[in-house]
Regions:
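Positively charged n-region of N-terminal signal peptides that target proteins for export
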Residues: 1-4
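N-terminal signal peptide c-region/cleavage motif recognized by signal peptidases
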Residues: 11-16
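A structural motif detector for short, solvent-exposed N-terminal "entry" segments of globular domains
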Residues: 18-55
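Exported/periplasmic cell-wall-interacting domains
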Residues: 20, 66, 76, 80-180
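Well-ordered beta-strand positions in beta-sheet-rich domains
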Residues: 24, 46-48, 71, 86, ...
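Structural motif
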Residues: 31-33, 71, 133
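Short, solvent-exposed loop/turn elements at domain surfaces
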Residues: 35-37, 43, 56-60, 82-84, ...
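Electropositive
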Residues: 44-73
Length: 180
């Protein structure tokens, strides 16, 4: 009986601490919100996000401060970030690489490295001419008033510290993130 009790307790705590693999995020840059979704159902909405200083759209080069449109996954989670928590996205995607290669922004070797990383479910190179280190993060010690007034990131999506702490309970590496 004790064994069953311990098994049930361990199962419950393992389940409670693990994010649902069917949950995904829709980042609506125009509406400045993130919808936490399961299938087509919206479970909750995080409002008043900030995006890159350059707005949102097609990133063309490192340092353009644009939040990229596209479909990504959370590739890694930095629990001890200067922005409180950092959910690194698998940017650039294979589609980003294809567009950049066609436009002559990246060479064939860079294109191949990005595509191969995605084929093997690895994090794509973060040091290409397209940039990298795009993610969802909190404020850390940044000024909440600036966050509420301006788009201030270098291309990331920023939430308040309370929001990022809450979101960290709902997502994990592998969570799909669609940015539009």
């Amino acid at each position: 009986m004790l064994r069953i009790y311990l098994l049930l307790c361990c199962s419950f705590f393992s389940f409670a601490a693990y994010a649902d693999s069917n949950v995904w995020l829709l980042v609506d840059t125009a509406a400045r919100k993130i919808e936490v979704k399961k299938g087509q159902m919206t479970l909750e909405t995080l409002r008043e996000i900030a995006i890159g200083r350059g707005g949102a759209g097609l990133k063309t080069h490192r340092g353009d401060n644009i939040t990229p449109y596209g479909n990504y996954r959370i590739g890694w989670i930095g629990e001890r970030s200067s922005f409180r928590k950092f959910f690194g996205l698998t940017y650039p995607s294979a589609e980003d690489a294809e567009k950049a290669f066609r436009k002559g922004i990246i060479d064939r070797l860079t294109y191949d490295r990005i595509v191969t990383a995605h084929q093997f479910n690895q994090i794509p190179p973060q040091n290409t001419p397209l940039g990298g280190q795009i993610g969802i993060h909190g404020l850390g010690s940044a000024d909440l008033r600036i966050h509420q007034t301006f788009d201030w990131t270098h291309g990331c999506i920023a939430l308040t510290n309370t929001q990022i702490d809450h979101l960290s309970q709902l997502v994990d590496t592998g969570t799909v993130v669609k940015i539009k």
